[in-house]
Amino acid sequence: MEASGSSSQSQDSGGVHRETEDHYQETELHKHHGKARERYKRDKSSSSSSSSSSSSSSSSSSSSSSSDSSDEDQPSRGPRKHRRRPRRDSLRGADHGELEVLKDELQLCGGAAGEMVPTGESGLRRRGSGSAEGEVEASQLRRLNIKKDDEFFHFVLLCFAIGALLVCYHYYADWFMSLGVGLLTFASLETIGIYFGLVYRIHSVLQGFIPLLQKFRLPGFRRTN
């Protein structure tokens, strides 16, 4: 009886010990699971905070770069506007000047029918004559440089006529015939000279001889009135 009682007590004590060990293991497992969950939550929160901080830093950097670019663009745009303004002012001034010139020309053209009217290219022409005829005549006069009242031209032609008169009198000894030849020579040279522009040619030839005459002129010689 005593042996059976001791064996039953030992079995009861062993069962209790096993139950305590199982309970202890379960509690440790629960602790490990709780710690693992806490670590996972901490890691997740830290990763979310780092991502939010990185996004905020990127947004701040982008905003700063955009503000810098806007600050740089503003001074660069300013001078361009200031540069464009003088061009517009110059164009307006040119248009205003052209309008004033046109007004002056209209005022000059508003005279009587027989007045001299200035034109842009053809020089002076008489109002009432055709514009095409005036331009042609002015261009011909400018090209030939003809002056019908040129005293030097008439003097040269008169010299030719006198020379022809003297030669004719030397050969024929008749003053009437000599005067006729001289007058014909003078008239023919006048018409030919006016028509073909001999005035300009004679002037050009004499102007070519003027430098030679100046070279041969004595340095101490002066003209006296």
Curated annotation (Swiss-Prot):
Compositionally biased tracts (Basic residues): 30-39, 78-87
A Pfam family assignment: TMEM40
Residues found modified as Phosphoserine: S129
Composition skew (Low complexity), residue ranges: 1-14, 46-68
Compositional bias (Basic and acidic residues): 15-29
Keyword Transmembrane helix on entry: yes
Segments forming a coiled coil: none
Region (Disordered): 1-96
Subcellular location per the Swiss-Prot or TrEMBL entry: Membrane
Modified residues (N-acetylmethionine): M1
GO annotation, cellular component aspect: membrane
Record key words, sorted: Acetylation, Membrane, Phosphoprotein, Transmembrane, Transmembrane helix
Mode of membrane association: Multi-pass membrane protein
Residue stretches spanning the membrane: 152-172, 179-199
Protein name, entry field: Transmembrane protein 40
Source organism per UniProt: Mus musculus (Mouse)
